[in-house]
Amino acid sequence: MTFSNEPRIITTDDHPIRHHMIDKDAMKVLRILRENGYAGYLVGGGVRDLYLNKSPKDFDISTDARPGQVRKLFRNSRTIGRRFRLVQVFFHGKEIEVSTLRSLSEYDLDGPESVLAPNNTYGSLGEDAQRRDLTVNGLFYEIENNTIIDYVDGINDLDKSVVQFVGEPVRRITRDPVRMLRAIRHAGRLGFRISPESWQAICENHEKLTLCPPSRIRDEFFKDLHSGALSEWLKLALDTELFFDIFGLYKKPLSQKEGAEERPYREQLSAIAKVIDRCANLAKDSGKRGLANDFLLALLLVPWANANFDLVRQRVKGAEAFRFSKILRDELDKGLGIQLNLRRSIRQEMVILLSNLPQFLRYHESNSWPKWIKKKSYYKSCSLFCELYAESLTGNQAELPVSPLKQEYRSKPTEQSRSKGNRSRRKSYNPSFSSKKKGIFGLKK
């Protein structure tokens, strides 16, 4: 698709966005940029969601100011990023991301294709719009005239409920295959359809996703795991076969289109995805942190374990149980651990949840729990795991804990919060080099 250099301007009368709908801190950043002679625009998903009368998760801003210039305007900020530097401005535990307008590089326009080629040059508003992944995310909103600036026909796609790539689909996928995941994500979350050209490009090029770093694929998938729209994502990912480029271990159970075994396992996956969505939506509605990534990922792997090991019918004890868990761990490592660059501790937690499921299901069905198992360190997590799996079978909703289980891959605490926490737990002492009262010449008394 080719786009004009002249944008479409959508005026106040033709769109629903009003200033009171925008986060007050984002408005503050926009005003400060303007007052200091810089252009500032609300951009991307924030504009998309406001246009659709949804509540944006984030309010991102683009500007013609360079990162260093933005830092000078906001003392409560930091610069992050490797491929492209952007500034995070902090407001009471919340952050507003401010990026400098970028251009498509000459390499991207005319040169040979390559995965994740460098793209860190600054550019104009139109160039920035055309380097974005999807047309529905390529919109700009400016507060002075309350107008939406559209270089990529994104408003038309929003009105038609269509997701499509900015530019020629195959070329855009080749440049960065992760764009396929984002297209499926937004189609699933918004309930949109993917344009025929973009859909065909994904179906024909899905295997290119394996060229991306495993950690990047993992982090992108975890966004979908907690999106509340995993079941919609799953359907699209399976139909395009992109799912198998992430979960190669599912290829055998689900690959035979007419096979007798395919329907049950696909139905199991779909039912589990709906349970995960319920958990994610409850966490978002309550403002609390959701269940851990390893916990939800293990839940999504139960149909695979059933297909390969007849998991829920296992009756093993003692040394035999240990051998089974080791086999499970080895297969998990080969099929997913390396592919998603999962830490060893994460893989071990997943094996504990999966290998204990048969035993916990038996106690769950009889509603009789031995005292010894309640004393195990893994009792709470395994019992909840069992209840959520049972929910996927029966539809009877499990009761979720008030405090979520430990979340892996969570963001690191700030230095300030870390030091406070350590002070409250750490025993006070004077080191041997102390110069305080109880020491003599810097030595302990």
Where are these regions (language model features)?
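Catalytic cores of the polymerase beta-like nucleotidyltransferase superfamily
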Residues: 1-445
